[in-house]
Amino acid sequence: MEAQLSLIIMSPEQVLEQCEITYVKLPGKVAPFEVLKGHAPMITTLNSGKVTYQTRDGDVKSLSVKSGFVEIRNNKVSVCVEL
């Protein structure tokens, strides 16, 4: 599967994941949402929940988070979370 987005997930202490992905699902403050290639630029806060993403190899991974924020720009998704 061809990767279409770059993802970096970090906490205040360390980089938790950095990879190429096809999609990511995030626990938005108002409602969960999914980011695909070509998503509009956005910065928003995250609630507690799961960050779920699919790598270019087709593996689906997830990470439980307490809170955080995400910046989406030019097919790059930067997520800063509190675990």
Regions found by a protein language model. Give the residues of each.
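Compact, glycine-rich, soluble single-domain proteins
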Residues: 2-83
